[in-house]
UniProtKB/Swiss-Prot annotation:
Record organism: Prochlorococcus marinus (strain MIT 9313)
Cross-referenced CDD domains: cytochrome_b_C (cd00290)
PROSITE patterns: CYTB_CTER (PS51003)
Main location: membrane
InterPro entries: Cyt_b/b6_C (IPR005798), Cyt_b/b6_C_sf (IPR036150), Cyt_b6/f_cplx_suIV (IPR005870), Cytochrome_b_C_euk/bac (IPR048260)
Membrane protein topology class: Multi-pass membrane protein
Gene Ontology molecular function terms on file: electron transporter, transferring electrons within cytochrome b6/f complex of photosystem II activity; electron transporter, transferring electrons within the cyclic electron transport pathway of photosynthesis activity; ubiquinol-cytochrome-c reductase activity
Listed GO biological process terms: photosynthetic electron transport chain
Family named by the database record: Belongs to the cytochrome b family. PetD subfamily.
Gene Ontology CC: one annotated term: plasma membrane-derived thylakoid membrane
Protein name, as recorded: Cytochrome b6-f complex subunit 4
Assigned keywords, A-Z: Electron transport, Membrane, Photosynthesis, Thylakoid, Transmembrane, Transmembrane helix, Transport
Domain of life: Bacteria
Function of the molecule: Component of the cytochrome b6-f complex, which mediates electron transfer between photosystem II (PSII) and photosystem I (PSI), cyclic electron flow around PSI, and state transitions.
Amino acid sequence: MHILKKPDFSDPKLRAKLAKGMGHNYYGEPAWPNDLLYIFPVVILGTFACLVGLAVLDPAMLGDKADPFATPLEILPEWYLYPVFQILRVVPNKLLGIALQTLVPLGLMLIPFIESVNKYQNPFRRPIAMAFFLFGTVITIYLGIGACLPIDKSLTLGLF
């Protein structure tokens, strides 16, 4: 039992369509040789030239030697954990800090149910979701910047 039906080349209608060139994609610029032979190598060589240029002009410097007896005053996590670190650092009760972090995914899961009557996929036509995500982005950036500052200036970002 065959899954695919093989074309019947003895059919005159099919032969007429194939003679006219129907069934083949002839519009636009062909991928061979234009893209594969000329454009791709230019992009690859350009990327390689940028990497070599950056390596020559701005080489990665080695930092200070590791000293296990000299620890910094405050150890910071990786940059993508700054907002979470700031929440745990500022909230007085650590259990409350963890509860605040669990509210983020729960709030994200709630958005489709809040705005279920909106049938549009365009984000600019979904004001509740856009407001929610913009507010979350601003708060995340605010917490990330605050995590880089000392604890006494972290909430006001040193502005007040």
